[in-house]
Amino acid sequence: MAQAKQDMGSGSVKKLMLQLMIPAVVAQVVNLLYNIVDRIYIGHIAGIGAAALTGVGLFTPILMLLNAFAMLVGAGGAPRTAIALGQGDKEQAEKIISNSFTMLLLFSVVLTVVFYAGAPTLLRLFGASDATLPYALAYSRIYILGSVFVLLVLGMNPFITTQGFAKTSMLTTVIGAVINIILDPILIFGLGLGVRGAAIATVLSQAVGAVWILRFLTGKKTILRLRKDCMRPEKKVILPVMALGISTFVMMSTESLLSISFSSSLARYGGDVAVGAMTVITSASQLCTLPIQGICQGGQPVMSFNFGAGKKSRVKEAFRFQLTLCGCYTCLFWLLMMLAPGAVAGIFTSDTALISYTTWSMRIYMAGIFAMGFQIACQQSFMALGQAKVSLLLACLRKIILLIPLIFILPHLLPDPVFGVFLAEPVSDILAATITTITFFSRFNGILERGAAKV
């Protein structure tokens, strides 16, 4: 632990952040493979690829809710663990990790029961047609039964990164993704299981990742260990974790509501082909958002530790570096989406009608994504500094206050309602990024002057 303190508190800020960011970004990119490799293979199944891809895409709102509950714990607990470690309170840090593990197990039991029973009704609500519902159900029911592994991987892995073991955290995702990539073609095509094979491959790979995490957090190499005597939930531990994680939870759960809004509106105005295009666009957009989250995930321990230690200049340097990386990446990604949307769409499907539809709609949807890096960098920095309330408000701004209403309003104001649905995204991206960035810079110095509260 002393070595971790010395590195976080006195080493080169940029070097430290890169050491943590690179594995975190790699882990997020590899994690992206969990989400898109299935879709790439499914989209190329002969004869049913487009319908099967659309059906699996309709499972996205449930998938996002599962991820949201995992990150309610992981994104809330990891910064508090780092702050406690920076304050020299190892006992409290281990209580946070152990309580968080218990909460993830409880969430997984409840969510499995609720989503498995409600899947048929929910998928219809999301816009499933008679042609796409069988594929949506086949995939979702298997995935839901393995949701405990999903929650453990997503919820506990941040506790490895926040201790400075970024490479170990990266390996968690890499191992699972490699297994998924190997199993997908075997189960989907070799054994002829189709979408069921894709779901089985994902669940098995997540199970291996969960075992890897638990072995590390109970082993000798970790600084902070999972402890049986600390697993009984304590209100004074859990509530602060939930309070800080709620902003990420809102961001991810509103992604679910957002996905429902897009799918239902596009099903109404454009039919299955529009919903299928949205599935491809959503997958492509993760190529932007997940690496940014990896950058912020790598920057969080450095910011949180030095904030807890009262080293303001290092916190400022860490934020500037994080903002620069996020902003540059999203601008480059925007350029790619404007120049070659058809090539990106072709990765996910061989259906020419779906590729053509996706090409023009992707340009509209991605028109404001260059601003996303600034919004996420500032919003995640609020979290790293323990500012739960303002982080939550900013998480609500883009999706709840701006985007979801625009999805339903713009189709009535424009001659082409489908164009209006897709246009809602860039309008809200640019407005939200502007407001979030201004808010952060107006509060940043004041937060640093007040310092971190005792965890």
Positions of PLM-derived features:
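Small-residue-rich hydrophobic transmembrane alpha-helices
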Residues: 53-113, 150-169, 263, 277-335, ...
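Helix-terminus/linker motif at the lipid-water interface of multi-pass membrane proteins
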Residues: 29, 33-54, 123-130, 186-193, ...
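Short runs within selected transmembrane alpha-helices of multi-pass transporters and secretion channels
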Residues: 74, 143-161, 169-177, 198-211, ...
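Hydrophobic/aromatic residues in alpha-helical transmembrane segments
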Residues: 22, 38, 77, 118-119, ...
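Small-residue hotspots at the loop-to-helix junctions and early N-terminal turns
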Residues: 50-61, 136, 140, 199, ...
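Transmembrane helical elements of multi-pass membrane transporters/channels
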Residues: 19-38, 142, 176, 205-209, ...
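N-terminal transmembrane alpha-helices
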Residues: 8-48, 61-76, 80, 105-112, ...
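Short alpha-helical transmembrane segments in multi-pass integral membrane proteins
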Residues: 1-23, 81-148, 190-245, 303-368, ...
